[in-house]
Curated annotation (Swiss-Prot):
Entry superkingdom: Bacteria
Function: Catalyzes the phosphorylation of the position 2 hydroxy group of 4-diphosphocytidyl-2C-methyl-D-erythritol.
EC number of the protein: 2.7.1.148
Pathway: Isoprenoid biosynthesis; isopentenyl diphosphate biosynthesis via DXP pathway; isopentenyl diphosphate from 1-deoxy-D-xylulose 5-phosphate: step 3/6
Disulfide bond entries: none
Binding site for ATP: 99-109
Main EC class the enzyme belongs to: transferase
NCBIfam families named among the record's database cross-references: ispE
Subunit-structure text: Homodimer.
Designated name of the protein: 4-diphosphocytidyl-2-C-methyl-D-erythritol kinase
Keyword annotations of the record: ATP-binding, Isoprene biosynthesis, Kinase, Nucleotide-binding, Transferase
Organism: Erwinia tasmaniensis (strain DSM 17950 / CFBP 7177 / CIP 109463 / NCPPB 4357 / Et1/99)
Active site: 10, 141
């Protein structure tokens, strides 16, 4: 049977870097919220013993694609626990709407959707907590997509506390550049010593992203986009970019600004949601 699963985008409503670890990773405080917009995965399980990606990405070998890596990891863990036969296989395809290097979590969301969906379809019986631990091996943002609730995150982003920020409307714009996360985190000018604060203080303060200054300095396209959006609404970078979002109370207000966007800029309008569309789909299975 062929099933279809959402792989939603996320926004970092704020992102603060509170330190750098000896292993090079950074300690963060960030607020994740999902969007009702993203990629779509189509999954067909079978008894072929093979995992096939029917929609390869240009320049990304299948074995490096997070979709295949997630499927292999789940299969290995399930077979280690004797909850899956050796001939378990699947055909997987993704319809991409989220840009690579956009700060929307597209690859991590794809991986999380594979873990959650195949755990259900293969009936491997892992808990969301176990799946999130597997996901952390694939990327720091994978656990929040697996757990499926808007969250305040600490550590490298893996320690999650459920929160319920307002479900606002967002205009998300892409400046036409792709930004690799290591480029930003290795920048010598990046702020790495923002004081750690309690969640109550963070939620009552103005939201910021510590990566934004570095990205705006390095990428003229991002600087111009943020400056333009700030004329209309509170706006900032998500993740390490490149996407920038502006927040609105209504869809119509977001659409009015979108219609004024300079020619050639790509973007979309979506609502923030505190329960992932992936988990809404899972609950309907």
């Amino acid at each position: 049977m062929i099933t279809t699963w959402p792989a939603p985008a996320k926004l970092n409503l704020f992102l603060y870097i509170t330190g750098r670890r000896p292993d090079g990773y950074h300690d963060l405080q960030t607020l994740f919220q999902f969007l009702d917009y993203g990629d779509t995965l189509t999954i067909e399980t079978n008894q072929s013993g093979t995992l096939r990606l029917l929609s390869p990405l240009d320049g990304v070998p299948d074995d490096d694609n997070l979709i295949i890596r997630a499927a292999k990891l789940l299969r290995e863990q399930a077979q280690k626990h004797s909850t899956l036969p050796a001939n378990a296989g699947a055909n997987l395809a993704v319809t991409k709407r989220l840009p690579m290097g956009g700060g929307l979590g597209g690859g991590s969301s794809n991986a999380a959707t594979v873990l959650v969906a195949l755990n259900h379809l293969w009936q491997t019986g892992f808990s969301l907590h176990q799946l999130a631990a597997f996901g952390l091996q694939l990327g720091a943002d994978v656990p929040v997509f697996v757990q499926g609730f808007a969250a305040f995150a600490e550590g490298v982003g893996e320690r999650l506390m459920p929160v319920s920020p307002p479900e606002k409307w967002y205009l998300v714009m892409h400046p036409g550049v792709s930004i690799a996360t290591p480029l930003v985190f290795n920048d010598p000018l990046l702020t790495r010593n923002t004081p750690r604060r309690e969640i109550s203080a963070l939620l009552s303060a103005e939201f910021r992203n510590d990566c934004e200054a570095v990205v705006r300095n390095r990428f003229r396209e991002v600087e111009q986009l943020v400056s333009w959006l700030l004329e209309y609404a509170p706006s900032r970078l998500t993740g390490t970019g490149a996407c920038v979002f502006a927040e609105f109370d209504t869809e119509s207000a977001a659409r009015q600004v979108f219609e004024l966007a300079p020619a050639g800029l790509q973007g979309f309008i979506a609502q923030g949601v505190n329960i992932s569309p992936l988990h809404r789909t899972l609950s309907e299975q």
